[in-house]
């Protein structure tokens, strides 16, 4: 304390206490109902910022006055579940067992905005999928027309004998390509203008697997909204941040409330399934620290948390760097080597894949 003086020490400790409280609010925000409290439910988006601040306070107090480091340390310990979810570390990599299947989920951004697929210039999304060696592929923003037709997509993925395409609204759709028989495909009932979920039953090695492919409610941010956010990041003056924050938080909160109802519907479907294994995947349009992720993942394991490493950022544009694409597995299934694959840049999302085997 002698290095900074007693007065400033108490001031910094008070600020530290506020940062710990805010960290805990963010860490436990998935338990806040977005319908009742839409703004507060978005607190999880700020989790990494308050995590970094508390880590800095921890280091600072360890150097200046170790006794006060206990405050941030306790805050971090109480947030360990959220930290593990947001930034998993899996040092020991298990070998993929024989008989495991490779599962892949990808928001294709309309196959790179309906880029043509020709012999001399193949569509990079289709090339990636064709060479992925995945056994089951779930696609979001399956939008065709103009330069790329569904027939061409099916031909490019002709190694998959079983396929299903479902148009959600307008041109937007969801698709599934599988090496295993797709027994049925039904929409999950919930309100949405342009998004949706499809539940497939797939026969895999004698067992019936429930696969739920999701594209949950988007945040409806226009290009103007995204430009406001980019300007805030480039030049964060007080007026820009104040005006921009109100605009963005309002839209995020509104979308969060809609997704909450959708998440509840998916959770009911999963809870009522009495068959074999369950895989819930797709674009959740929400961070790992959210009501959506918690409710949809109730009773399931997050494949990336179980066998991935790092942030796993799957949305890659407009400075909104979050892991919003997921693969969740029932307790009788285990994931291996879950990867958010940033080697392909053809969409505003990166694909996420993992190997899946029975325990």
List PLM regions with ranges.
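Acidic/histidine-rich helix-loop elements
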Residues: 105-122, 144, 220-255
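Active-site environment of divalent metal-dependent phosphoester hydrolases
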Residues: 110-115, 144-148, 169-173, 194, ...
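Metal-dependent phosphoester-hydrolase catalytic domains
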Residues: 8-23, 28-40, 44-61, 70-73, ...
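Hydrophobic/aromatic beta-strand patches that form the interior of the parallel beta-sheet core
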Residues: 104, 164, 212, 279-281
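Active-site metal-binding loops of divalent metal-dependent hydrolases
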Residues: 106-108, 142, 216, 283-284, ...
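Structured beta-strand-rich core segments of catalytic domains in phosphoester-bond hydrolases
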Residues: 77-98, 123-126, 130, 136-231, ...
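A fold-wide structural signal in alpha/beta-hydrolase
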Residues: 102, 210-212, 353-355
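N-terminal, active-site-proximal structural segment of metallo-dependent hydrolase catalytic domains
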Residues: 1-155, 171, 263-264, 358-359
């Amino acid at each position: 304390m002698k290095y900074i003086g007693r007065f400033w020490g108490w001031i910094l400790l008070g600020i530290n206490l506020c940062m710990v409280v805010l960290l805990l609010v963010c860490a436990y925000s998935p338990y806040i109902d977005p319908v009742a409290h839409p703004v507060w439910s978005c607190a999880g988006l700020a989790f990494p910022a308050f995590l970094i601040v508390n880590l800095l306070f921890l280091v600072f107090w360890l150097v200046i006055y170790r006794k006060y480091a206990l405050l941030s340390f306790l805050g971090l310990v109480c947030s360990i579940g959220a930290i593990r979810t947001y930034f998993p570390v899996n040092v020991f990599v298990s070998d993929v067992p024989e008989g495991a299947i490779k599962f892949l989920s990808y928001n294709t951004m309309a196959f790179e905005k309906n880029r043509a697929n020709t012999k001399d210039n193949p569509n990079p999304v289709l090339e990636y999928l064709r060479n992925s060696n995945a056994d089951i592929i779930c696609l979001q923003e399956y939008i065709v027309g103009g330069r790329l037709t569904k027939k061409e997509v099916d031909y490019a993925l002709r190694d998959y004998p079983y396929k299903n395409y479902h148009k959600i609204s307008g041109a937007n759709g969801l698709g599934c390509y599988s090496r295993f028989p797709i027994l049925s495909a039904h929409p999950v009932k919930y309100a949405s203008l342009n998004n949706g979920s499809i539940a497939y039953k797939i026969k895999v090695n004698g067992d019936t697997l429930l696969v739920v492919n999701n594209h949950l409610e988007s945040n409806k941010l226009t290009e103007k909204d995204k430009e406001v956010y980019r300007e805030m990041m480039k030049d964060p003056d007080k007026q820009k941040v104040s005006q921009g924050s109100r605009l963005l938080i309002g839209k995020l909160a509104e979308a969060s409330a809609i997704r909450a109802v959708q998440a509840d519907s998916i959770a009911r479907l999963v809870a009522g399934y009495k068959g074999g294994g369950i895989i819930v995947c797709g674009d959740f349009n929400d961070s790992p620290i959210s009501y959506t992720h918690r409710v949809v993942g109730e009773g399931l394991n997050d494949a990336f948390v179980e066998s991935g490493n790092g942030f796993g950022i799957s949305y890659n544009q407009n400075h909104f760097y979050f892991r919003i694409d997921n693969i969740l597995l029932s307790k009788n299934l285990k994931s291996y080597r879950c990867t958010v694959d940033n080697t392909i840049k053809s969409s505003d999302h990166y694909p996420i894949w993992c190997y899946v085997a029975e325990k």
